[in-house]
């Protein structure tokens, strides 16, 4: 892979943030310095994801996904995927980078072949409500789709079969994630609850079976994202209550609460904690929030190690990759 010295792709740590100010910003994670800003025209950015080979970043917005080059300083998207009628809320990649998946307010999850010169989507999974989140099972063969009616759909890409479960009717599923070991799936909803399932199957032709494990009353307000740590020992949940909470997967007890609440009684809310991403060693976490900042925290102590300031509006999504490719 050719990386130009001084580009984002040449840095072993890639940290990108985006949101409502129509920019994607790239940061030196250790120093807090913004190294590159890309103008994302026409739309806010709802989701960011770095390709597995670290060559590009996908920014999902209103009616399109734009791919920006990490190995040059080209300010323009090198590929644009269009043809979606509403906001795209979620984006991710197959581990080999062969295809991309998205989900959005047009009630569809889509698969896009990244090797094809044709920029149309190849497969569509239609549901009956706007989609908030899509995540890929580590087996690379099942997509988990969460929608605003409260349903979670498990779309088997090999057979096109799908299963559905509704943990809490009428509470919108805002985020779902499966840990890297494929032991657990978590989902959070608009009521602030986090549901966890044990996973079995999902190998060969066996479809994944979900066995309810626990319900965590994680937040008093809207929950926005859940993410397992790379070592599968932690689960983070982010919320409109201005906190990101970190739970131990050994017993799903609370380990650390990261809060952006002001200690000054007169100060109004600093806004929602929109999203998070763990470092590769699971010892740090980066959060995105609507006070225009991203922050790097120590997971164990809850201490803020770095703040990333420069966005003019809410930061609602981020992408973090500090894995060095062999």
Swiss-Prot record:
There is a cross-link at residues 86, 215, 245, 261, 305 (Glycyl lysine isopeptide (Lys-Gly) (interchain with G-Cter in SUMO3)). Disruption phenotype: Death around 10.5 dpc due to multiple defects in vascular system development. In addition, they exhibit a delayed development of their cephalic region. There is a cross-link at residue 313 (Glycyl lysine isopeptide (Lys-Gly) (interchain with G-Cter in SUMO1)). The modification N-acetylmethionine is found at residue 1. This is Target of rapamycin complex subunit LST8. Phosphorylation at Thr-51 by CDK1 promotes ubiquitination by the SCF(FBXW7) complex, followed by degradation. Ubiquitination by the SCF(FBXW7) and SCF(FBXW11) complexes following phosphorylation at Thr-51 by CDK1, leads to its degradation by the proteasome. Ubiquitination at Lys-305 and Lys-313 by TRAF2 via 'Lys-63'-linked polyubiquitin chains inhibits formation of the mTORC2 complex, while promoting formation of the mTORC1 complex: ubiquitination disrupts the interaction between MLST8 and MAPKAP1/SIN1 to favor mTORC1 assembly. Deubiquitination at Lys-305 and Lys-313 by OTUD7B promotes MLST8 interaction with MAPKAP1/SIN1, facilitating mTORC2 assembly. One of its GO terms (cellular component) is cytoplasm. Keywords: Acetylation, Cytoplasm, Isopeptide bond, Lysosome, Membrane, Phosphoprotein, Repeat, Ubl conjugation, WD repeat. SUPFAM superfamilies: Quinoprotein alcohol dehydrogenase-like (SSF50998). It comes from Mus musculus (Mouse). It is found in: Lysosome membrane; Cytoplasm. Its main location: membrane. Subunit of both mTORC1 and mTORC2, which regulates cell growth and survival in response to nutrient and hormonal signals. mTORC1 is activated in response to growth factors or amino acids. In response to nutrients, mTORC1 is recruited to the lysosome membrane and promotes protein, lipid and nucleotide synthesis by phosphorylating several substrates, such as ribosomal protein S6 kinase (RPS6KB1 and RPS6KB2) and EIF4EBP1 (4E-BP1). PROSITE patterns: WD_REPEATS_1 (PS00678), WD_REPEATS_2 (PS50082), WD_REPEATS_REGION (PS50294). Pfam families: WD40 (PF00400). InterPro entries: G-protein_beta_WD-40_rep, MLST8, Quinoprotein_ADH-like_sf, WD40/YVTN_repeat-like_dom_sf, WD40_repeat_CS, WD40_rpt. There is a cross-link at residues 305, 313 (Glycyl lysine isopeptide (Lys-Gly) (interchain with G-Cter in ubiquitin)).
């Amino acid at each position: 892979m050719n990386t130009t010295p001084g580009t984002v792709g040449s840095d072993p740590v890639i940290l990108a943030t985006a949101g409502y100010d129509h920019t994607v910003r790239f940061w030196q994670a250790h120093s807090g310095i913004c190294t590159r800003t890309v103008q994302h025209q026409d739309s806010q950015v709802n989701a960011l994801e770095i390709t597995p080979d670290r060559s590009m970043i996908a920014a999902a917005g209103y009616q399109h996904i734009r791919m920006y080059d990490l190995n040059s300083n080209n300010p323009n998207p090198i590929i644009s995927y269009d043809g979606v009628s509403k906001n795209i809320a979620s984006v991710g990649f197959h581990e080999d980078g062969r295809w991309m998946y998205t989900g959005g307010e047009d009630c569809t999850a889509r698969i896009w072949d990244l090797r094809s010169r044709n920029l149309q989507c190849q497969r569509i999974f239609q549901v009956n409500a706007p989609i908030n989140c899509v995540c890929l099972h580590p087996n690379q063969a099942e997509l988990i789709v969460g929608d605003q009616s409260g349903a979670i759909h498990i779309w088997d890409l090999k057979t096109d079969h799908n299963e559905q479960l509704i943990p809490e009717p009428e509470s919108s599923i805002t985020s779902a994630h499966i840990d890297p070991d494929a032991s657990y799936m978590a989902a959070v909803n608009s009521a602030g609850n986090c549901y966890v399932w044990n996973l079995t199957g999902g190998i060969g032709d066996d479809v994944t079976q979900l066995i309810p494990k626990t319900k965590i009353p994680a937040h008093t307000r809207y929950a926005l994202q859940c993410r397992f740590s790379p070592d599968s020992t932690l689960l983070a949940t982010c919320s409109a209550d201005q906190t990101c909470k970190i739970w131990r997967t050994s017993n799903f007890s609370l380990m650390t609460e990261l809060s952006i609440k002001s200690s000054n009684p007169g100060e109004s809310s600093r806004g929602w904690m929109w999203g998070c991403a763990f470092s590769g060693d699971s010892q740090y976490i980066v959060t995105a929030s609507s006070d225009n900042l991203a922050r790097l925290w120590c997971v164990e102590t809850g201490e803020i190690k770095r703040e990333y300031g420069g966005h003019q509006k809410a930061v609602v999504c981020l992408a973090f990759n500090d894995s060095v490719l062999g």
